């Protein structure tokens, strides 16, 4: 506080006042003649300390509150401890003619102590006066007191009526509300300040797009919260204005209450700052930044109330913001930002690597062209238009594994047609049908795309069902002459899908894992190689089609136990079938049907060979009753003739295959029942292990059959053992795995009864036919 000094002395008094008084000092009375030096002289005072509010008025008066305890610093000369009697205050009414004199000092201001201190002037020049201000009377709101001073007892008193000598006592302002109620209101305001601050961050941070996403794919609780918040959040600027206006209003009211409750000064500043910053900003914003959805949904009723209360101010401002800034759309990610967001949040989103690859491939689909994923024309499997659909060509098609094969004419870049593998369902390789005949008949349309076509456009074309294979071409304008279309390669639906899933799709026919890296696929061990069945010059004396050779090989390997892969390897069996004189033909003698050359087996004659009928029909006569029946292709005889006696288990002269069972049901029942009962006995084998047939097999027409002798079969067994089992250091070989368990001998009387039973069934079936 500061106060101007009023000078009531001459030149000496003013000089002393300028030298001795600080800014808040008051000048005392002036005199016309110098005073004795030994008498005390009071020059002025200033406020040193007050336990309640005190201030200077605009007129320079010192204003204090009733009930205050003041400490005044008094300045003067020759002050002593007993100088308190020369200082007094009396009531003063400005503008009144009849004011009280200094002798009538006021009892409302009680002087309790005077402490004198030496300030270095050679005499005591300052003193501390403690002054107690008593409460005002009920009818008064303020009262003015003036300073009265004297030089000593019996000397006159001087009344200081200037502003610097006046002291105004004001009525203490009592709060409108009790302190406990103010504390409660402050607590509520702090809570509201925190709510508004938190909602301002929590609700405004909830993007409208994000709320729509949560409504569709969040948890049930999140969906419920988002459904509540989304209508309010849609009014973004209105919500923002309401929250900010409410926050400012609450903080302003809170500051005013704290100032009234605590008082002005550093304490009020620290209290309001601490309460608003810590409880109204930091804590709620930290909470709402992580749980804004739940907090916003549970306090939505309060938000709506404040939006309604602040409507007259907030709504017009929000409309101005809408017009100036436009409608709030929300955060929208483009393809690149969305992909990067997924990559950054991958450790926390629970998306596995394979799913991330699929998402990345789908997002990058529109950025890649056909040229990036196509198979170059030189790496494509194609067929020339003049090809013939024989066994070799069909085998190449089957080995390639492709279902759609381009057909070119003259050069590979000139693709004129396309062949579907399903078109070959009714094509017989023996017919050697020209490829052009099949392609002209089906006439599949060709689908061309340019090399710069995006993969999403190609995928849409493939989805229409026109074709799953497209020919990639470009316009070649290099060199002289007119531009022309140049074929660059092929693209399939599989290529597009591989780019989407970011992984290679390998099937059993793929040769490379990637068309660009040319990394070969590890060949499967069980993959069938049909090239070994192709025709070779001078390899077979009797002409047999490759497909029939393949069928015979499969039948012997799977249906005849003696030729099972455990005994005879498939490679050895194939070499055996290609051995000279194994596949033979018999031309039927029409003139003499009973001629010996028409018989494959004759009763009671030694036979050391196995026969498999490939084409034609034979008549089998077996049993004591000479029962006869006919058999066709893929029936076999003489299993015991090539087998050793100890391993003999199949003694039927005729065994019908599953290939022959589809001819007719009656034929199946007849042949199967007969073949299961015709058997020999161990007495048929001589001591030299010779086999004597107890049945006859006679041709009924031209035949083509496989004939394997015992010597050839034993050689095949030995070759298979050498191929599958390395020799031991002692030179021995591992014994073959006996997968065929030896069966007990079938007694002759049991065989006879079975033959009689089958005989009667055959007679009934024959009569029915």
Swiss-Prot record:
Keyword Thylakoid: no
Major place of residence: membrane
Compositionally biased intervals (Basic and acidic residues): 732-746
Ranges for domain CBS: 374-435, 442-508
Membrane topology listed for this record: Multi-pass membrane protein
UniProt keyword annotation of Plastid present: no
Residue intervals of the CNNM transmembrane domain: 175-355
One cellular component term from this protein's GO annotations in UniProt: plasma membrane
Subcellular localization(s) per the UniProt record: Cell membrane
UniProt record similarity statement: Belongs to the ACDP family.
Role according to the record: Probable metal transporter.
Other facts noted in the record for this chain: Shares weak sequence similarity with the cyclin family, hence its name. However, it has no cyclin-like function in vivo.
Name of the featured protein: Metal transporter CNNM4
The organism of origin for this protein: Xenopus tropicalis (Western clawed frog)
Gene that encodes it: cnnm4
């Amino acid at each position: 506080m500061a106060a101007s000094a009023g000078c009531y002395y001459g030149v000496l008094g003013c000089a002393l006042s300028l030298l001795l008084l600080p800014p808040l000092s008051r000048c005392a009375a002036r005199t016309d003649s110098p005073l004795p030096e030994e008498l005390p002289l009071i020059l002025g005072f200033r406020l040193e300390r007050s336990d309640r509010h005190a201030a200077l008025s605009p007129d320079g008066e010192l204003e204090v509150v009733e009930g205050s305890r003041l400490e005044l610093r008094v300045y003067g000369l020759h002050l002593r401890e007993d100088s308190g009697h020369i200082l007094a205050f009396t009531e003063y009414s400005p503008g009144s003619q009849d004011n009280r004199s200094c002798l009538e000092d006021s009892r409302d201001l009680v002087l309790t102590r005077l402490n004198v201190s030496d300030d270095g002037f050679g005499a005591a020049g300052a003193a501390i006066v403690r002054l107690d201000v008593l409460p005002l009377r009920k009818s008064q709101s303020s009262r003015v007191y003036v300073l009265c001073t004297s030089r000593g007892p019996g000397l006159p008193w001087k009344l200081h009526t200037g502003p610097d000598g006046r002291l105004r006592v004001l009525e203490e302002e009592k709060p409108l509300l009790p302190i406990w109620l103010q504390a409660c209101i402050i607590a509520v305001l702090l809570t509201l300040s925190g709510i508004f601050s938190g909602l301002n961050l929590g609700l405004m941070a909830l993007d409208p797009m994000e709320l729509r996403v949560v409504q569709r794919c969040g948890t049930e609780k999140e969906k419920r919260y988002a459904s509540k918040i989304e209508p309010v959040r849609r009014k973004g600027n209105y919500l923002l204005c309401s929250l900010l206006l409410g926050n400012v209003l609450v903080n302003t009211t809170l500051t005013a209450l704290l100032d009234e409750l605590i008082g002005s000064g550093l304490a009020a500043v620290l209290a309001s700052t601490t309460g608003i910053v810590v409880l109204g900003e930091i804590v709620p914003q930290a909470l709402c930044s992580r749980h804004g959805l739940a907090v916003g949904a549970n306090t939505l009723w309060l938000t709506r109330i404040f939006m309604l209360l602040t409507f007259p101010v907030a709504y017009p401002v929000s409309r101005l913001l809408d017009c100036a800034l436009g409608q709030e759309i929300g955060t929208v990610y483009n393809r690149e930002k969305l992909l990067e967001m997924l990559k950054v949040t991958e450790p926390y989103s629970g998306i596995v690597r394979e799913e991330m690859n699929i998402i990345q491939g789908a997002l990058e689909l529109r950025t890649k062209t056909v040229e990036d994923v196509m198979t170059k024309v030189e790496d494509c499997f194609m067929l020339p238009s003049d090809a013939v659909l024989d066994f070799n060509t069909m085998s190449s098609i089957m080995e390639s594994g492709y279902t759609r094969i381009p057909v070119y004419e003259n050069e590979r870049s000139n693709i004129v047609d396309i062949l579907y593998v399903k078109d070959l369902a009714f094509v017989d390789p023996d017919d050697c049908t020209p490829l052009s005949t099949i392609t002209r008949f089906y006439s599949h349309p060709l689908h061309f795309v340019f090399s710069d076509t995006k993969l999403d456009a190609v995928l849409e074309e493939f989805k229409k069902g026109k074709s799953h294979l497209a020919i990639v071409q470009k316009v070649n304008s290099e060199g002289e002459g007119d531009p022309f279309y140049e074929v660059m390669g092929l693209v399939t639906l599989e290529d597009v899908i591989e780019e989407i899933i970011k992984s290679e799709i390998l099937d059993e026919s793929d040769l490379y894992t990637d068309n660009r890296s040319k990394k070969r696929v590890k060949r499967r061990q069980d993959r069938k190689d049909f090239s070994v069945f192709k025709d070779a010059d001078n390899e077979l004396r009797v002409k047999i089609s490759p497909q029939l050779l393949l069928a015979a090989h499969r039948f012997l390997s799977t249906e005849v136990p003696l030729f099972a892969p455990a005994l005879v390897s498939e490679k050895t069996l194939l070499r055996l079938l290609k051995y000279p004189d194994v596949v033979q033909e018999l031309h039927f003698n029409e003139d003499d049907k009973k001629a010996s050359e028409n018989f494959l087996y004759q009763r009671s004659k030694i036979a050391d060979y196995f026969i498999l009928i490939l084409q034609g029909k034979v008549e089998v006569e077996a049993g004591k009753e000479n029962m006869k029946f006919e058999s066709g292709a893929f029936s076999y005889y003489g299993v015991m003739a090539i087998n050793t006696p100890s391993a003999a288990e199949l003694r039927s002269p005729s065994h019908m295959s599953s290939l022959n069972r589809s001819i007719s049901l009656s034929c199946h029942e007849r042949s199967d029942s007969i073949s299961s009962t015709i058997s020999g006995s161990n007495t048929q084998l001589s001591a030299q292990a010779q086999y004597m047939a107890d049945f006859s097999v006679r041709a009924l027409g031209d035949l083509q059959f496989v004939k394997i002798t015992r010597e050839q079969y034993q050689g095949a067994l030995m070759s298979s053992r050498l191929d599958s089992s390395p020799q031991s250091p002692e030179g021995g070989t591992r014994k073959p795995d006996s997968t065929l368990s030896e069966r007990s001998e079938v007694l002759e009387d049991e065989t006879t009864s079975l033959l009689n039973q089958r005989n009667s069934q055959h007679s009934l079936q024959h009569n029915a036919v």
